[in-house]
């Protein structure tokens, strides 16, 4: 989460008299370069944001996923040497095969079409 994200998220807390804060204000709070009075004023606001953010993260971790959506990172595909040589030979002959040809190559090599 960036400092700008924190500043923007503060507006979502709906604390009376508190809007969003600039990235530079958050930076100065972190580096302890704000005045003492400003630090005292901002601490409960930032504490409220932190508690809400941590609560949302805990809830997200405890909630079972109905489906594994966009956050799951795809693993890197590794192709064995024989399949790699076959693919290189196919693409040397035809650098831009049609979708049907790619599907046929994938089936022949027992690979997924999106891997080919």
From Swiss-Prot:
Q: Which residues bind DNA?
A: 72-116
Q: Does the keyword 4Fe-4S apply?
A: no
**Chain positions covered by the region annotation Disordered:** 56-79
Q: Name one GO molecular function term.
A: DNA-binding transcription factor activity
- Could you tell me what this protein is called? POU domain, class 4, transcription factor 1
PANTHER family named among the record's database cross-references: POU DOMAIN, POU DOMAIN, CLASS 4, TRANSCRIPTION FACTOR 1
Query: What family, per the record?
Result: Belongs to the POU transcription factor family. Class-4 subfamily.
CDD domains to which the protein is assigned, alphabetical: homeodomain
What are its GO cellular component terms? cytoplasm; nucleus
UniProtKB keywords: Cytoplasm, Developmental protein, DNA-binding, Homeobox, Nucleus, Transcription, Transcription regulation
Q: Which GO terms describe its biological process?
A: cellular response to cytokine stimulus; cellular response to estradiol stimulus; neuron projection development; positive regulation of gene expression; positive regulation of osteoclast differentiation; positive regulation of transcription regulatory region DNA binding; regulation of DNA-binding transcription factor activity
> What's this chain's function?
Multifunctional transcription factor with different regions mediating its different effects. Acts by binding (via its C-terminal domain) to sequences related to the consensus octamer motif 5'-ATGCAAAT-3' in the regulatory regions of its target genes. Regulates the expression of specific genes involved in differentiation and survival within a subset of neuronal lineages. It has been shown that activation of some of these genes requires its N-terminal domain, maybe through a neuronal-specific cofactor.
* Gene3D superfamilies according to UniProt: Homeodomain-like, lambda repressor-like DNA-binding domains
Q: Which PROSITE patterns match?
A: HOMEOBOX_2, POU_2, POU_3
Q: Which InterPro entries match?
A: HD (IPR001356), Homeodomain-like_sf (IPR009057), Lambda_DNA-bd_dom_sf (IPR010982), POU (IPR013847), POU_dom (IPR000327), POU_domain_TF (IPR050255)
Occurrences of domain POU-specific (ranges): 1-54
Subcellular localization is given as: Nucleus; Cytoplasm
Its predominant location is nucleus
UniProt source species: Gallus gallus (Chicken)
């Amino acid at each position: 989460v960036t400092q700008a994200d924190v500043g923007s998220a503060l507006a979502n807390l709906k604390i009376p008299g508190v809007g969003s804060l600039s990235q530079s204000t958050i930076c100065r709070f972190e580096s302890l370069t704000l005045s003492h009075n400003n630090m005292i004023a901002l601490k409960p606001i930032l504490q409220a944001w932190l508690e809400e953010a941590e609560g949302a993260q805990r809830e997200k971790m405890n909630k079972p996923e109905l489906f594994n959506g966009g956050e799951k990172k795809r693993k890197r595909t590794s192709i064995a040497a024989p399949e790699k040589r076959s693919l290189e030979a196919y693409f040397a002959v035809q650098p831009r095969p049609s979708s049907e040809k790619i599907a046929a190559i994938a089936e022949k090599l027992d690979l997924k079409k999106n891997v080919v």
